[in-house]
Amino acid sequence: MAALLGRRFGMAAAALIALAALGSAASGTASKSSFVKSTVKAHDVVIFSKSYCPYCRRAKAVFKELELKKEPYVVELDQREDGWEIQDALSDMVGRRTVPQVFVHGKHLGGSDDTVEAYESGKLAKLLNIDVKEDL
């Protein structure tokens, strides 16, 4: 009888531990979602990136080309302990798990291809309210 009770309580304890872990993971994602939202709100341009990613480098190069007065705020996910959690929160928010994810004035612009396309079409300059330099 004691062994049966021990197993039942052991299973209950394991279930409680699992539920607590799920709860802390969910609250971790919620806090990372708050981090993403507050970061996007606090800066004109935000790039969620990974330092080794060629697509991220391409998106960052677009903003260098524009010669903005204020550089984009870059969050290098691979250089943060909570980078995976932030990436999960981004995925929940924008429906994409890939990087980069670019935000301009609080609005999601997209990834690398979206950023380059917006730059080439002039849409990005309009979003940033800057004059486009014409090639001579």
Curated annotation (Swiss-Prot):
One Pfam family of this chain: Glutaredoxin
InterPro entries in alphabetical order: GLR_AS (IPR011767), Glutaredoxin (IPR002109), Glutaredoxin_euk/vir (IPR011899), Glutaredoxin_subgr (IPR014025), Thioredoxin-like_sf (IPR036249)
PROSITE patterns assigned to the protein according to its UniProt record, in alphabetical order: GLUTAREDOXIN_1, GLUTAREDOXIN_2
Subcellular location: Cytoplasm
Protein family membership: Belongs to the glutaredoxin family. CPYC subfamily.
GO biological process, one term: cellular response to oxidative stress
GO MF terms, alphabetically ordered: glutathione disulfide oxidoreductase activity
Reported function: Has a glutathione-disulfide oxidoreductase activity in the presence of NADPH and glutathione reductase. Reduces low molecular weight disulfides and proteins.
Organism classification: Eukaryota, Viridiplantae, Streptophyta, Embryophyta, Tracheophyta
The protein, known as: Glutaredoxin-C8
Entry's Gene Ontology cellular component terms: cytoplasm
UniProt xrefs under PANTHER family: GLUTAREDOXIN 2
Keyword field: Cytoplasm, Disulfide bond, Electron transport, Redox-active center, Transport
CDD domains for this protein: GRX_GRXh_1_2_like
Residues in Glutaredoxin domain copies: 33-135
Annotated organism of origin: Oryza sativa subsp. japonica
Disulfide bonds: 53-56
